[in-house]
Amino acid sequence: MIETNKKASWSELCPDVLRCVFELLSFSDLNRTRSVCSSWHSASRHCVPTQNQIPWLILFPRNNVNNNNNNSCVLFVPDDRDSLYKTKDLGVGFMLSNCLATYGSWILMMDRLCNLNILNPLTGEKIDLPRTKFDLPRLESSVACLWIDEKTKDYIVVWKIKNSLVYAKKGNHTWQQVFSMNEELSVEQIVYEHKTQKLYVHFNDSTLSIWRLSREDPHGVFENYIPFDFVFQDFLPDRRTDEELYVKEYIDTRLNIALTTSGELLKVASVVQKSKRWLFRIYKMNYIKRRWERIESLGDEALILDMGITIVAKDIPGLKRNSIYISGFDYGRKHLDHIFIFDLTTQESEPLPYCVSSSNDFSDARWFFPSFSQSPY
């Protein structure tokens, strides 16, 4: 046997071995391997990252004279806090559109004529939805929700348009009506749960309507959720001493709904103050006492407030358990001070890193969950 003193070099590892390892890495870790050396860069080229379990933040381009025809989105990946990524050019029509909702890798967009489409910003794949038959004014925003199967591209979009709630599924050529409402009632939020095919509709009077979309004709489902409301005093540690200061600082309140991983319904009350501070209270229904009761913790879950869902967050790098991921509603979509992760344990907000906060030229922001069926490189 001939012995050799030559040391093995990690840059000379077999490409097949490298690919076996790379396929186990997250998007961020896989991206880091590409900068190690040319052989690792080559081996990683056709690798697909492992299934993504953390929300990414997508920042949409602003439509103004200083935009320099930038029709791409900026992506922030929480487990890679020092870097930003950019999508491909998504076209002028994209820059002139507004995002209404996200699901998985997909975003629901509304163009200037109030027509909707579903877009994958990572691949550029686009699904046009039925044209609207209504004479609509130019809408800057609207209430909608999205569900889509990443493989089959089956989808459901539910949209509040004028005084009606309508939906479209894959194969539909027109929008179908769920229900109509009087002008005094306004839809604040829509959450769809595909396992049960239930649609949760939250109104501005804090009431809730539940519908099942499993048939051709949607039908209402009775569930005994009593109306819920809150007053600003609920947020005061000491009502006698704190009320005056609170009123001076107060900007607005918001009430959201969310579904946990086990299917429980939560109500999330929030307050934003002039100091850019946010306060949160989370409640769930006590059916025995017939009242909403505050819960102090989400446990090993995290709440994505944009989407109205919680996700499992235990032992997942880059994902904070017992936290709320928020993109600021109407306040934060153009102000990075209101896009953050709120830690329910410490009651403190974790701001975005400098690489994101220095990206001022954006019009909107959303959390979403991209996945990869092919190499992103």
Curated annotation (Swiss-Prot):
Pfam families: Beta-prop_KIB1-4, F-box. This is F-box protein At2g05970. Residues 8-55 form the F-box domain.
